[in-house]
């Protein structure tokens, strides 16, 4: 049982990207699409959401083997000013009791690192954007099994993680010259992926066209 909390505006595209990755496993996986209860989507119809998604309130009594929290295009907003931040706090606390392992992506990773570990983020002078070579720091991590030693990973973010605020309760798993990419709890219950393993071959091009308008 895997849950996907989809915070992205284009929910159909994001769910397809993650479904493609999850579908590559030989295991039989049941994917539940989840959305924030308190937030009204401007880019996905309510009919679509009611048909294919459940709110977090509707799934919070369930147990999940894995839970994915996506990014969100709100990098410029302080965490506490995000409209659905209180619900995010409840969800992050809930993952500690109802989820075996959680993966946080991009903004989701920044938010969870801030909440659980007090990790600070810094606004970059320019947006980190493109496909960059990365370094595997911990080759023994089960999360990185089958990954090359120097993977090329899509990056699209305005903020960077303050390395000095990363404490001993976290382990750096993947690093790069463009910044930290992946960290994990020492207990192995959560991983924080600051870039975009889910992006397809059009994602960066479409973001570029959006940004230059």
Segments the model singles out, each with a brief description of its role:
Residues 14, 43, 78-79, 113-115, ...:
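Short glycine-/acidic-enriched loop or helix-start segments at secondary-structure transitions
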Residues 1-38, 53, 59, 63, ...:
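Amide-donor transfer/coupling interface in amidating biosynthetic enzymes
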Residues 47-50, 82, 86, 155:
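Conserved phosphate-coordination/catalytic loops
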Residues 44-46, 72, 111, 149, ...:
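Residue-level signal for well-ordered alpha-helical segments
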Residues 37-50:
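N-terminal beta-loop-helix "entrance" segment that forms/cooperates
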Residues 69-138:
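Cysteine-nucleophile active-site neighborhood
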């Amino acid at each position: 049982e895997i849950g996907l909390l989809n915070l992205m505006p284009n929910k159909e595209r994001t769910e397809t990207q993650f479904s493609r990755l999850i579908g590559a496993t030989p295991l039989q996986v049941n994917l539940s699409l989840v959305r924030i209860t308190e937030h009204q989507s401007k880019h996905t119809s309510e009919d679509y959401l009611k048909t294919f998604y459940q709110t977090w309130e509707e799934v919070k009594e369930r147990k999940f083997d894995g839970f994915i929290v996506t990014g969100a295009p709100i990098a410029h907003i302080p965490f506490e000013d995000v409209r659905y931040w209180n619900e995010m706090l409840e969800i992050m606390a809930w993952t500690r009791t109802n989820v075996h392992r959680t993966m946080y992506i991009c903004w989701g990773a920044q938010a969870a690192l801030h909440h659980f570990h007090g990790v600070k983020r810094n606004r970059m002078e320019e947006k980190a954007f493109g496909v960059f070579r990365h370094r595997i720091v911990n080759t023994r991590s089960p999360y990185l099994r089958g990954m090359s030693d120097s993977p090329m990973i899509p990056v699209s973010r305005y903020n960077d993680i303050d390395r000095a605020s990363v404490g001993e309760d976290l382990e750096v798993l993947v690093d790069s010259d463009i910044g930290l990419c992946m960290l994990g709890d020492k207990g192995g219950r959560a991983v924080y992926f600051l870039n975009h393993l889910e992006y397809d071959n059009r994602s960066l091009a479409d973001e570029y066209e959006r940004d230059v308008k």
